[in-house]
Amino acid sequence: MSDFDSNPFADPDLNNPFKDPSVTQVTRNVPPGLDEYNPFSDSRTPPPGGVKMPNVPNTQPAIMKPTEEHPAYTQITKEHALAQAELLKRQEELERKAAELDRREREMQNLSQHGRKNNWPPLPSNFPVGPCFYQDFSVDIPVEFQKTVKLMYYLWMFHAVTLFLNIFGCLAWFCVDSSRAVDFGLSILWFLLFTPCSFVCWYRPLYGAFRSDSSFRFFVFFFVYICQFAVHVLQAAGFHNWGNCGWISSLTGLNKNIPVGIMMIIIAALFTASAVISLVMFKKVHGLYRTTGASFEKAQQEFATGVMSNKTVQTAAANAASTAATSAAQNAFKGNQM
């Protein structure tokens, strides 16, 4: 009966509770696939829970992460520290050089007042023979050449010690082979001859050359030192009846007696080391000689000046001139009488 009382032109869904807007809005918000989801169907069907949740904005405060680069003030501090260390190093070097110059000046003043006293070889005061030379690297030799001159001095000492050991090597060889008396005698002679002669003939000229920048002394050193190098090579070879425990003599002694042969081989190695070091130092001294400005012309001038300024040469020349003048006058007088 109510159907007949209703308005035929009214909306039929007006009184439908399922058509209410609030209900239809909720049903539209249901995730898709919820009605079609079947847990027993193919696993490739996405589950209803696979809906992406909306991104929640981060409410934490922004924090800046530190970078790997150091701040500018840190680099400036490091550069300042390096510059300060370099300045301190230079200052210490300058102070050391100033102290060295001050010490050398005081020593020169003492030498000018009291004179230079010989101090080499260092002998005791009660020894009957006194020192023959004056030697002080810090006073006589410039700083840039002191190391080279000291090495040459140590090389001379090394060769002297080798010659001294050579005496014992030849003595041991003579004990196992009585025909080696000549080698033992010559070994003593070489020690007594080469030790002082090498010091006077090539080391002292080298010392004086660097002390006074003398071209003439450099040439004397080069000439004598070449001969010294040849002697080192011959001693390392060790020919029979030459008084040297070289390689040839060592092999011969090794056939006679093994301990004696080993002793001689050690001495031969020392002679070989002397020859090699001599060659190396010769090249080094020659390189320094080329930087000093020395030349053969300067050596000739120094030789002529030294000869003419030598009192002994002057006296001999004056005596020769007076003798020649006297003989010429006598011959002229005799010629006039005739």
Curated annotation (Swiss-Prot):
The modification Phosphothreonine is found at T45. GO terms for biological process: endocytosis; establishment of localization in cell; exocytosis; protein transport. Residues 1-64 are annotated as: Disordered. It is found in: Golgi apparatus, trans-Golgi network membrane; Recycling endosome membrane. Residues 177-181, 239-261 are lumenal. It is a multi-pass membrane protein. InterPro entries: SCAMP (IPR007273). The modification N-acetylserine is found at S2. PANTHER family: SECRETORY CARRIER-ASSOCIATED MEMBRANE PROTEIN 1, SECRETORY CARRIER-ASSOCIATED MEMBRANE PROTEIN SCAMP. This is Secretory carrier-associated membrane protein 1. The gene is Scamp1.
